Amino acid sequence: MANFAPLKGYMLFCLDRFIERYGVQGPFLEVGCGRGDVAAHLAAKGWRGTAIDFSDDAVAHAARALKGHSGVTVARQALAEVTGTFRCVILWDVLEHIEDDDGALRTIAQRLDAGGHVLIAVPSNPHEWRWDDELYGHWRRYTVDGLRAQLAAAGLPALAFWDFTFPVFWAMRRAYTRMKSPPALPVDREAATKASTSVNAWDVPGLSRWLDRTAPLWLPVHHATFRLFRHAPHRGHEFFALAQKPAAG
């Protein structure tokens, strides 16, 4: 799903609204940058930052996506190895791949400037667990209350939770995972996580390519979904969480 162009476009649409409504600023750190779509989107706005991943393939993809954007550094690096602080930390479809997610949130809090934001996208609602969760190497799905408590424990009070899948993308995933027999599922979560950069569970020959080509036509759907359904994170299968480190003093 992360490589499905219409959904990816809507996630970037929501990112722009977070920036506008909550004053999210760079420089940024993107953890688990994958193909570099988010970092490239921010770089095109003139943001500076760092994009990291532990997959060689992901770093190579991201470096190509960010070619010509000298303000963004791409590195093969783990979160624990990052030094310095940032105004914004972004983790999209990453936290669910980390066994010690509480430890990761504490590290993120250390990498944030006072008053800085963390923007997280995670699979939501445990009852939505399907075979594609295993394909991508997920450890878990999240609830609003559970992630809110985890963020608070890390010193990152939550500001907002927005669903970005209900009803259209949620219904598409429900139908797809019922109709398609699951492929051979990996037993190694780390290998599955690395492969998730290029693996697309939503792979229907012909249909997938056609849907990707229609991505620019989805803007009316994005506007309607944002206006009507973003405040229903209990209904879809993924949501955003925005939190902020308290200002100094």
PLM feature segments, named:
Residues 172-219:
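C-terminal helical/coil "lid" or tail adjacent to the Rossmann-like core of SAM-dependent
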Residues 49, 118-119:
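A short hydrophobic/small-residue beta-strand
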Residues 1-88, 92, 103-105, 163, ...:
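Conserved N-terminal segment of class I S-adenosyl-L-methionine
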Residues 98-102, 122:
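A structural helix-start
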Residues 93-97:
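A short His-aromatic
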Residues 120-140, 144-149:
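Short, glycine-/aromatic-enriched active-site segment of Class I SAM-dependent methyltransferases
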Residues 156-167:
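Conserved S-adenosyl-L-methionine
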Residues 102-117:
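A short glycine-rich, Lys/Arg-flanked "PGG" loop and its adjoining helix->strand segment in the class I
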